[in-house]
């Protein structure tokens, strides 16, 4: 572990993708989740609605619940003055891609030389088939921007290994619970909803977390599209009504 000196300054980041907090099996992810890169909320909501309107996939999605024990550990961490200052800068968005500029902004403001990231996430976000910066490869871009000065730990969902096959490099990064970072101190906080990877019926839990963060930290910026839960029921009803109308013609 690198020791900070007058010539080194490490920016410590807690990155939270709320898709981590899903209690979900691999089959449901593979058959019921929209996938896609950085879909806007409006588009991913329409895609999700198709799965909720279909009885077979709706039944699978209804089995997706929240990892309450892990979420409670996160709440405890966020409330602790030992882990976060009240003045901690916070950014809350839909896509994880926005963390890239957020990190660069505070690397400059803190005059930091090193970056230490704990990523709580269902996905590793190191690489995909896209060379351009996106929600699924932002970590590799940060790593390339700060070669030999970037340290990453990944708290992975229990289903992550089943879905995405850890190689040895990824396996070395993995921590199995938020409990493992209970003594960490962080400089900045990032949270994303990842609309194409979070089952919308769990949005209420995300919004409860936003409320906690907003009360705890005054320096918080929240993207408009994630300030309220997605209205899946309205679109599902429209799909069903359109189908009934079509069948009666």
What are these regions (language model features)?
Residues 2-249:
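Conserved alpha-helical scaffold segments that buttress catalytic/binding sites
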């Amino acid at each position: 572990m690198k020791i900070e000196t007058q010539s080194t300054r490490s920016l410590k980041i807690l990155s939270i993708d709320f898709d981590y907090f899903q209690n979900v099996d691999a089959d449901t992810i593979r058959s019921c989740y929209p996938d896609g890169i950085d879909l806007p909320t409006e588009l991913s909501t329409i895609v999700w609605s198709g799965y909720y309107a279909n009885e077979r996939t709706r039944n699978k999605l209804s089995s997706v619940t929240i990892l309450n024990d892990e979420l409670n550990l996160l709440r405890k961490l966020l409330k602790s003055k030992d882990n976060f200052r009240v003045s901690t800068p916070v950014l809350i968005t839909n896509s994880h891609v926005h963390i890239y500029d957020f990190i660069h902004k505070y690397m400059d403001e803190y005059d930091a030389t090193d970056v230490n990231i704990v990523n709580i996430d269902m996905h590793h976000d190191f690489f995909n088939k896209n060379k351009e910066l996106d929600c699924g490869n932002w970590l590799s871009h940060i790593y390339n921007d700060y070669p030999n000065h970037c340290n990453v730990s990944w708290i992975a969902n229990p289903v992550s290994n089943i879905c995405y096959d850890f190689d040895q490099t990824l396996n070395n990064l993995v921590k199995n619970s938020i409990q493992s970072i209970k003594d960490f101190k962080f400089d900045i906080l990032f949270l994303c909803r990842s609309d194409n990877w979070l089952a919308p019926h769990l949005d209420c839990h995300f919004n409860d977390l936003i409320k906690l963060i907003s009360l705890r930290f005054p320096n918080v910026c929240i993207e408009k599209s994630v300030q309220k839960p997605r209205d899946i029921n309205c679109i599902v009803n429209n799909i069903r009504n359109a189908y009934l109308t079509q069948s009666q013609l």
